[in-house]
């Protein structure tokens, strides 16, 4: 029960042939086959492409000056004037 037997598949095939006709159905199957063939060809062409060049190395940071550390003198210079006046 609920399984599809061979007679069910024959009935489905006959109904499809009636709706689409013999010519349209074979044309559709031919188009599907051409699509699969071109897809396989496209996939095989992707495999033969040469690998990309390696990316350029990142610049080294050893020659760049370091930012000043947050000392109390630097922090005091960065405090806005209205806060300084309120203390």
Curated annotation (Swiss-Prot):
Please indicate which superkingdom the organism of origin belongs to.
Bacteria
Q: Where in the cell is it found?
A: Cell inner membrane
Choose any GO biological process term that the UniProt entry carries and state it.
Answer: protein transport by the Tat complex
**InterPro entries (alphabetical):** TatA/B/E (IPR003369), TatA/E (IPR006312)
Annotated segments matching region Disordered: 40-87
Protein topology in the membrane: Single-pass membrane protein
**Keyword match Cell inner membrane:** yes
**Entry's Gene Ontology molecular function annotations:** protein transmembrane transporter activity
Q: What are the protein's UniProt keywords? A: Cell inner membrane, Cell membrane, Membrane, Protein transport, Translocation, Transmembrane, Transmembrane helix, Transport
Coiled-coil residues: none
One GO CC annotation? TAT protein transport complex
Q: Which Gene3D superfamilies match?
A: 1.20.5.3310
The principal localisation class reads membrane
Q: Which Pfam families match?
A: TatA_B_E
Q: How does it assemble?
A: The Tat system comprises two distinct complexes: a TatABC complex, containing multiple copies of TatA, TatB and TatC subunits, and a separate TatA complex, containing only TatA subunits. Substrates initially bind to the TatABC complex, which probably triggers association of the separate TatA complex to form the active translocon.
The record's annotation in NCBIfam families points to: PRK00720.1, tatAE
What does this protein's UniProt record list under function?
Answer: Part of the twin-arginine translocation (Tat) system that transports large folded proteins containing a characteristic twin-arginine motif in their signal peptide across membranes. TatA could form the protein-conducting channel of the Tat system.
UniProt record similarity statement: Belongs to the TatA/E family.
Put simply, this protein is called Sec-independent protein translocase protein TatA
Q: Which gene encodes it?
A: tatA
């Amino acid at each position: 029960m609920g399984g599809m037997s061979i007679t069910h598949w024959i009935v489905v095939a006959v109904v499809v042939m009636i709706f689409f006709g013999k010519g349209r159905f074979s044309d559709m199957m031919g188009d599907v086959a051409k699509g699969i063939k071109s897809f396989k060809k496209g996939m095989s062409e992707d495999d033969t492409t040469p690998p990309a060049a390696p990316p350029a190395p990142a610049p080294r940071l050893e020659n760049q000056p370091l930012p000043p550390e947050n000392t109390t003198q630097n922090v005091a210079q960065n405090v806005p004037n209205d806060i300084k006046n309120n203390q």
